[in-house]
UniProtKB/Swiss-Prot annotation:
Organism: Polynucleobacter asymbioticus (strain DSM 18221 / CIP 109841 / QLW-P1DMWA-1)
Top EC class, one word: hydrolase
GO MF assignments: GTP binding; GTPase activity; metal ion binding
Entries under PANTHER family matching the protein: TRNA MODIFICATION GTPASE GTPBP3 (PTHR42714), TRNA MODIFICATION GTPASE GTPBP3, MITOCHONDRIAL (PTHR42714:SF2)
Subunit structure of this chain's protein: Homodimer. Heterotetramer of two MnmE and two MnmG subunits.
GO biological process: tRNA methylation; tRNA wobble uridine modification
Protein name: tRNA modification GTPase MnmE
Cofactor(s) listed: K(+)
Binding site for K(+): N230, T249, I251, T254
Species lineage: Bacteria, Pseudomonadati, Pseudomonadota, Betaproteobacteria, Burkholderiales
Stretches assigned to the TrmE-type G domain: 220-379
Length: 457
């Protein structure tokens, strides 16, 4: 996909019936195809109402055609967009006819993300902006939409590029000193290198904090409700969802398989998974459900370990077993349900941060406190103004850059004797930051990133 120079075509709108469906074509020299399709030229950047005909010159649709002459287009190439009526069969016929008439030009069906890849390769967007297009389409909340839009406008890229520029200026000073050792100046003091490095570190830490919030906005939180049978996991799911999505009975072991529901808490997507109660069983179906419970726990971002006054014996040993299965850095939140059965109710709840949170899924008592606790535990700070969406890839690059900045601090502490190593660590930090916007990224990784996009994007 990285080296294809031929024109490409795809339906750019979602599959299914709709009022409008868009067929998009991109490539060099599409003026010839326009003439062949419509027997006339089109004024660039103007919508023209036209009749689209099949090979027998029979009308297929009346559509709007818009022709963008490169480089003044999304991809940087010539682009033709056909705004048709949105029937799947109709769009298929339009695609078929375009491919027939575009065969001489080498017109082929686009691969996933190929339009956006061409925009990136032609410097219309950087990699972070290209990813923001996909994130905008996949946004699960209003906050995620706004965050992706900021990234698409270049807010995240500007911060990254600004930090790269500061490191570049620091590297210039270091390397110029290495080139003229006879000057014997105390570079680190005279150039205020340590102060500059401290400023870079502070900005990088702020970027990391913002990116962590952005990943929560983009991906949401995989929240697993786990515990023994009959502690109220399904009741809690229903309470959080605001509707009855899971069957609730007094019979232990009612939930035999995972039940998943997505909600939002203060704009943060939460993917809640109700699981089969964990216990030893000879029931083959229940055992399969328990196996899937452990699978969900191993993939969780947060586990709510639910107990109740009437929980089966072995509560603490079960908790230890869950802790052993959790992924690294995955927190566990201890919650006691059915507080309405406890004498004094919520009054017995301790103010100790480590003590279990008391709730009642039946009455709703303590649910608001639970929601706030969830947000706190996953690291959401509630700051949505100016937030951007980010990916695991971005966090990894920022983390590696931070590691090299930390090493450069160590070499800076050694004075002029370690300037070469100081410069090398700055260079490596710069490289990792550059991978976020795509300035320094292997072609195979680029292909992997864009292959996750929709066809037509």
């Amino acid at each position: 996909m990285m080296t294809r120079k031929v024109p490409i075509i795809a339906v750019a709108t979602a599959p299914g019936k709709a009022g409008v469906g868009v067929v998009r074509i991109s490539g060099q020299g599409l003026g010839e195809l326009v003439e062949t399709l419509f027997h006339r030229s089109l004024a660039p950047r103007q919508a023209t109402l036209l009749t689209f005909c099949d090979a027998d010159n029979q009308p297929i649709d009346q559509l709007l055609a818009i022709y963008f002459v490169g480089p003044a287009s999304f991809t940087g190439e010539d682009v033709l967009e056909l705004q048709c009526h949105g029937g799947p069969q109709l769009l298929e016929l339009v695609m078929k006819r375009c491919l027939e008439l575009g065969k001489a030009l080498g017109l082929v069906i686009a691969e996933p993300g190929e339009f956006t890849l061409r925009a990136y390769l032609n410097n219309k967007v950087d990699l972070a902006q290209a990813e923001a297009i996909a994130d905008l389409i996949d946004a699960q909340s209003e906050a995620a939409v706004r965050g992706a839009a900021r990234s698409l406008q270049g807010s995240f890229s500007e911060d990254i590029n600004g930090l790269i520029e500061e490191i570049t200026q620091l590297r210039i000073l270091v390397e110029s000193t290495l080139d003229f050792p006879e000057e014997e100046i105390e570079f680190l003091e005279n150039a205020q290198a340590r102060e500059r490095l401290a400023a870079v570190k502070k900005k990088l830490e702020a970027l990391q904090a913002g990116a962590k919030q952005g990943k929560i906005l983009r991906d949401g939180i995989q929240l697993v409700l786990a515990g023994a049978p009959n502690v109220g996991k399904s009741s809690l799911l229903n309470r959080l969802a605001g509707e009855e999505v899971a069957i609730v009975t007094p019979i232990a072991g009612t939930t035999r398989d995972r039940v998943k529901e997505s909600i939002q808490i203060e704009g943060v997507p939460m993917h809640i998974i109700d699981t089969a109660g964990l216990r030893k069983t000879v029931d083959e179906v229940e055992a399969k459900g328990i196996e899937r419970t452990w699978e969900a726990i191993r993939l969780a971002d947060l586990v709510i370990f639910l107990g109740a006054p009437n929980a089966e014996p072995g509560h603490e040993s079960l908790r230890e077993e869950i802790l052993g299965a959790l992924p690294a850095k995955c927190p566990i939140l201890d919650v006691i349900n059915k507080s309405d059965l406890i004498e004094g109710g919520l009054a017995v709840s301790s103010s100790n941060e480590a003590s279990p949170l008391l709730i009642s899924a039946k009455t709703g008592a303590g649910i608001d406190a639970l929601k706030q606790k969830i947000l706190h535990v996953v690291g959401w700070n509630g700051a949505q103004e100016g937030a951007i969406v980010s990916r695991r890839r971005h966090l990894d690059c920022l983390e590696r850059a931070a590691e090299h900045i930390a090493k450069s601090e160590q070499f800076a502490a050694n004075g002029n004797n370690s300037l070469e190593l100081f410069a090398e660590e700055l260079f490596l930090a710069q490289n990792h930051l550059g991978q976020i916007t795509g300035k320094l990224l292997p072609d195979d990784l680029l292909g992997k990133i864009f292959s996750q996009f929709c066809i037509g994007k």
